[in-house]
Amino acid sequence: MDASRPKSSESQSSLEAPRPGPNPSPNVVNKPLQRDSPGMVADRLPPKTGAVVIDMGTGTCKVGFAGQASPTYTVATILGCQPKKPATSGQSGLQTFIGEAARVLPELTLVQPLRSGIVVDWDAAELIWRHLLEHDLRVATHDHPLLFSDPPFSPATNREKLVEVAFESLRSPAMYVASQSVLSVYAHGRVSGLVVDTGHGVTYTVPVFQGYNLLHATERLDLAGNNLTAFLAEMLLQAGLPLGQQDLDLVENIKHHYCYVASDFQKEQARPEQEYKRTLKLPDGRTVTLGKELFQCPELLFNPPEVPGLSPVGLSTMAKQSLRKLSLEMRADLAQNVLLCGGSSLFTGFEGRFRAELLRALPAETHVVVAAQPTRNFSVWIGGSILASLRAFQSCWVLREQYEEQGPYIVYRKCY
């Protein structure tokens, strides 16, 4: 791999060229979730009180109204801060920038409110929510129920804090906290399935049965999209391409558009380099040539590097381990409902490689069906949109009066 200034070459590719998307598997529905059509949402929730679904991940935060097919706004889960210049009164404050805008100015101090999917900076998280709700969606939060997604193994105190923020800070009339994995299953029109979710900050395999997480059989890998981006950035630096924090979007674009999963890593390594080498033209006119890095990058998800004291396993082995912790009957059911989710599962070749490895790992008689929806990077949000639109769900909201009577602990009775 090497980087250089612009030169004429017909083999160069522009970053504007979209990466071909993977072909979705047949969506075999097992035990379907009853759902109303999106067009009926207005009959249930008047526009002024329509529920808002918020799915905040380590990489992006998605927000939109329940009943929509996709989120209205998606922003990077990042906050940029710098001191304000003192006003005439002599008071100073903090100026903040949300999402992609925070990366543009190198002098900003960047804050990432989530770590491995878990909120660790509540002030920063609330600023992002407020910006999305009040500035982007332009809603008055005291008029709208709010549904938040919650990751596996989230601390109980985080769920209590979500309730407090929703009612005390955002002044919402009602709220709900829903499991991310369960919402992903709902997005596929089911109530049971093995969720294989690899996003920006963490990777999980979570069995969901009849709408409940089976945490005893859940596997976790602290390696996901941000690690792949860091790997690719290091390769670009070694090629002599200087990068700053404002170039992170550039690295992400290269990763999403050109990296792919090899069906057989060793065979791909043995191919002549000219068969997979790509020369890319960057927006600033520079060029960079990428070779094996294009498939070595997402290979980390299938063969994670060893770390001292740990021997992490890849996605396919994680899925096998989750299934083996289930009863035989449940294992057979969920093996036919393996659901790929998360933005880091969108690489070309990902679905085929995962399916082939899982089939080899399980007994020959196991019937395996892997579903890979084209919009699986939005699976959690879509599931929340479906759930908050159902007539049967409307009695499940945690209401302000209930919170005032019972405090944040109401979340355990109403949401889990």
UniProtKB/Swiss-Prot annotation:
Subunit description: Interacts with ACTL7A.
Entry GO CC: acrosomal vesicle; actin cytoskeleton; perinuclear theca; sperm head
PANTHER family assigned: ACTIN (PTHR11937)
Result of changing A42D: In a colorectal cancer sample; somatic mutation
Alphabetic keyword roster: Cytoplasm, Cytoplasmic vesicle, Cytoskeleton, Disease variant, Fertilization
Xref: InterPro entries: Actin, ATPase_NBD
Any single GO BP term: single fertilization
Tissue: Testis-specific.
The protein's name in its UniProt record: Actin-like protein 9
Source species taxonomy: Eukaryota, Metazoa, Chordata, Craniata, Vertebrata
Family of the protein in this entry: Belongs to the actin family.
Associated disease: Spermatogenic failure 53: An autosomal recessive infertility disorder characterized by impaired oocyte fertilization due to oocyte activation failure, in association with structural anomalies in sperm heads.
Region of interest (Disordered), ranges: 1-40
Pfam families listed in its UniProt record: Actin (PF00022)
Function: Testis-specic protein that plays an important role in fusion of proacrosomal vesicles and perinuclear theca formation.
Taxonomic superkingdom: Eukaryota
Location within or outside the cell: Cytoplasmic vesicle, Secretory vesicle, Acrosome; Cytoplasm, Cytoskeleton, Perinuclear theca
Gene3D superfamilies: 3.30.420.40, Actin, Chain A, domain 4
